[in-house]
Amino acid sequence: MVAQNSDKMRALALKLFEINAFKFGDFKMKVGINSPVYFDLRVIVSYPDVMQTVSDLLVEHIKDKQLSAKHVCGVPYTALPLATIVSVQQGTPMLVRRKEAKAYGTKKLVEGIFNAGDTCLIVEDVVTSGSSILDTVRDLQGEGIVVTDAVVVVDREQGGVANIAKHGVRMHSLFTLSFLLNTLHEAGRIEKSTVEAVAKYIAAVQINSDGTFVGGDKGDVVRANDLQRTKLTYENRANLAKSAVAKRLFNLIASKQTNLCLAADLTHADEILDVADKCGPYICLLKTHVDIVEDFSDKFIADLQALAQRHNFLLMEDRKFADIGNTVSLQYGKGIYKISSWADLVTAHTLPGRSILQGLKAGLGEGGAGKERGVFLLAEMSASGNLIDAKYKENSNKIATEGADVDFVAGVVCQSSDAFAFPGLLQLTPGVKIDEGVDQLGQQYQSPEHVVKERGADIGVVGRGILKASSPKQAAQTYRDRLWAAYQDRVAK
């Protein structure tokens, strides 16, 4: 492994975390179990500077280890661009191994000019069990090519080194998972508990090259992931958040001990201000629909912001943006409401795709520039008969967790814990009411305990259950207590 004290190595580790090349949560692996950490180095192709740094370090590593071969070959597919750059920098011819032979043309499995007896150095991005490297080794050996070494970017430390060595191939890694975790912890990016949770998982989940588990007890393996989103405390999750306002909200919830959002769906400014003042001590978030306020004014917003500061809660405008980027930017930053100037958070549909995030960022303008702002993306709805399906939810999750604009995403509005895995996002679940049921307009209500413990809600949204109560203040306190107790039960399991 390259000298771990290198500033360049540590800077790269932090950069990979920043661009979501690896993330924490609960991810399904190829071997059939869930992992608390996932590497997706495919994203580096969108960051030429990162590609260059990784390739430079690979070349340096090859020189340090005095590895020589007549060819280099990247394991398909993520390692192919890395192997290409290594080939160019070293002046070493490259071979391309296909995952499957073409059914037409030359039908070759290995492309390039080579002779039997030639040596080849394998390049790989991430190694778990080592099976992908061994598949490449077998195909190269089938062509008479000699393979003795492989260089990899990340070793997950789950048996890959030993598995590959059994087949006469030495593995040399730039990073180990342990080094990456320690670097993030030392830089204050993750908690010690996260490091320990992943270490526990790695110790329990050692994998043979055929995908079976060392020791054979899959039951212990399945139980090893302690980084499932719903198991973690708000404090632990705050450090994993990519969004500054999400981090702030996590910490606010933890310190104030409330995961209650009040939906202030009222039509007069004085009514909203009154309920915000009475219920403010018990909520983490006040959700508005400013377009239904009949006497909206700048003074109303100033008074609302003052109450938010006094009682320590954030403001969310439930605008549900859903237009093209340019229109969304205008709706967010312009008009009579100037939402970006005062709302800490907004909501948006993912129907327009990733452009919705770019439009919102563009709409920050002068009013919201330099302030912590974020969005909750709508992945599911509580209305019966809504048209959102599983594919839409899956694509919404991708928009929330992948790409260059994830730093603007604070959370997801949804009804189920499987809508997303990343613990740095918050799940906002509407339709909370002590008396479960469906209203005359199709809104479905569920109890505080059900939405938190069964549905995975991090924040429960209550509207009429508080607004229609004889004492909104007492009702808010009751909902706060029950939602918080449900959260405590959830993380205690």
From Swiss-Prot:
Top-level taxonomic group: Eukaryota
Record-annotated active site: 320
Pfam families per record: OMPdecase, Pribosyltran
Entry's EC annotation: 2.4.2.10, 4.1.1.23
Record has Cell division as a keyword: no
S-S pairs: none
Matching PROSITE patterns: OMPDECASE, PUR_PYR_PR_TRANSFER
Region annotation Domain linker: where it falls in the sequence: 208-233
Keywords: Decarboxylase, Glycosyltransferase, Lyase, Multifunctional enzyme, Pyrimidine biosynthesis, Transferase
Positions of the UniProt region annotated as OMPdecase: 234-493
Catalytic activity annotation: orotidine 5'-phosphate + diphosphate = orotate + 5-phospho-alpha-D-ribose 1-diphosphate; orotidine 5'-phosphate + H(+) = UMP + CO2
GO terms, biological process: 'de novo' pyrimidine nucleobase biosynthetic process; 'de novo' UMP biosynthetic process; pyrimidine nucleobase biosynthetic process; UMP biosynthetic process
A single MF term (Gene Ontology): orotate phosphoribosyltransferase activity
Region: OPRTase, residue numbers: 1-207
InterPro entries: Aldolase_TIM, OMPdecase, OMPdecase_AS, OMPdeCOase_dom, OPRT, Or_phspho_trans_dom, PRibTrfase_dom, PRTase-like
CDD domains cross-referenced by the UniProt entry: OMP_decarboxylase_like (cd04725), PRTases_typeI (cd06223)
Family annotation (Gene3D superfamilies): 3.40.50.2020, Aldolase class I
Pathway listed: Pyrimidine metabolism; UMP biosynthesis via de novo pathway; UMP from orotate: step 1/2; Pyrimidine metabolism; UMP biosynthesis via de novo pathway; UMP from orotate: step 2/2
Family of this protein: In the N-terminal section; belongs to the purine/pyrimidine phosphoribosyltransferase family.
Name of the protein in question: Uridine 5'-monophosphate synthase
Gene name as annotated: r-l
